[in-house]
Design a protein with these regions (language model features):
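Predominantly cytoplasmic-facing regulatory/coupling regions of multi-pass membrane proteins
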Residues: 1-96, 143, 153, 157-268, ...
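Short amphipathic alpha-helical coupling elements at transmembrane boundaries
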Residues: 49-53, 116-120, 130, 210-217, ...
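Transmembrane helix boundary and interhelical junction motifs in multipass membrane proteins
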Residues: 69-77, 104-115, 254, 267-283, ...
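Transmembrane helix-loop junction
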Residues: 82, 101, 120, 245-246, ...
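Membrane-interface alpha-helices at helix entry/exit sites of multi-pass transporters
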Residues: 91, 109-111, 120-137, 290-302
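Hydrophobic, aromatic-rich membrane-embedded alpha-helical segments
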Residues: 91-119
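Membrane-embedded alpha-helical segments of transport systems
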Residues: 99-103, 127-148, 298-313
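Hydrophobic alpha-helical transmembrane segments in multi-pass integral membrane proteins
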Residues: 272-274, 280-304
Length: 347
């Protein structure tokens, strides 16, 4: 019996649904604890006061920016999974965002649920794995481009803010080296695959090479949906910028970009929603770049709340709709799975 089929007791065994539900419950508890700490711990009273005095208009703008960020992810998802029907693909994209927020598996949770939902939609598991890698690489490279531009602009004094090379040119240089190594990987992977001939490692090397080449092709091919990759990141940064505007204190834009992107690395830790972890990482990075700790702490909490709950709400609704469709049309799903398996067998 598969995980998505009904059990003998009539209860659907849906580990994905259970993971999402448990993640949301955990996030709710952690969120309540953080809010309680802000108002109960004397040293955090200043943060709580900043939060309560934020300008509603700018918070509304932050909500709009987060919705636009989600739309950006939908667009780049549909560009990468170009054979996926638009409505179905949009729901899978939103579900991935929700799982990435709620399930304590870092980014692996969102990719896993995306593969589970896509399997049988005329896509083999191998195709899904390669396309998922392309999606990850496209969004990662957009992050890299943005960080390099901000770091160089800040380091050479084009944009206002600290010019310490360790905080500006060093991060940009490390990212440039990493991107160069990534772009050189296809040739090395193909040589490795040729030396190995056949086997799992050779197949993995060939798949890696194809994913990187496909990523490069997507980034260089004119397609209006590519703006989604930029919008996904830039509107998310705009959420934080709007939250700063709501406090009346706004660090230089390049500082926001760099501190946001480096601080976001804490999101890889397997903590549901990175609650507490991400806020601490943001505060540390912004203070390192010279920002004031109290407004940064307030902005970090509000930013995280906005991004989490819009993503979770929209993504959970999309997941429920997908689940209903799966159970309503099991024969259609079986036909798609047979088609995908036959295509995979013929490759």
């Amino acid at each position: 019996m598969s995980a998505s089929e009904p059990s003998e007791a009539g209860e659907p065994k849906e580990p994905q649904a259970r993971q999402l539900r448990n993640g949301i419950i955990t996030l709710s508890v952690l969120g309540v604890l953080i809010v309680a700490l802000l108002f109960a711990v004397p040293g955090l009273h200043g943060v709580g006061r900043v939060v309560t005095r934020m300008t509603p208009g700018w918070l509304a703008a932050a909500l709009v920016f987060q919705i636009l960020s989600c739309v950006g992810y939908i667009l780049i998802f549909l560009l990468v999974f170009d054979r996926t029907p638009a409505l179905f693909g949009a729901r899978v994209a939103l579900t991935e965002l929700a799982f990435g927020s709620a399930v304590s598996l870092g980014g692996a949770g969102s990719l896993a649920v995306g593969a589970w939902l896509l399997h049988g939609r005329e896509l083999s598991l191998g195709e899904i794995a390669e396309r998922s890698a392309v999606l990850f690489l496209v969004t990662t490279l957009i992050n890299a481009i943005t960080l390099v531009l901000a770091g160089l602009a800040l380091g050479i004094g084009i944009l206002p803010g600290p010019t310490d090379p360790l905080l500006t040119l060093l991060p940009a240089g490390l990212v440039i080296v990493a991107v160069a190594a990534l772009l050189a990987l296809p040739r090395a992977s193909e040589r490795f695959a040729m030396a190995r001939g056949t086997g799992r490692r050779a197949a993995l090397a060939r798949g890696t090479s194809r994913s990187i080449r496909d990523t490069r092709a997507i980034l260089l091919r004119p397609d209006w949906r590519l703006v989604g990759a930029f919008g996904y990141l830039w509107f998310n940064i705009a959420v934080m910028w709007a939250c700063f505007r709501a406090t009346g204190y706004t660090p230089p834009i390049a500082v926001i970009v760099l501190a946001y992107q480096i601080g976001w690395l804490a999101n890889v830790l397997p903590v549901p929603g990175s609650v507490g972890v991400l806020e601490g990482s943001f505060v540390g990075m912004f203070v390192l770049y010279g920002a004031k700790a109290t407004p940064v702490a307030a902005v970090s909490v509000v930013y995280h709340a906005i991004t989490l709950w819009i993503t979770l709400t929209w993504g959970t609704i999309a997941f429920i709709r997908l689940q209903r469709d799966r159970h309503r049309h099991p024969e259609r799903r079986a036909a798609h799975e047979d088609s995908a398996e036959s295509r995979a067998g013929g490759q």
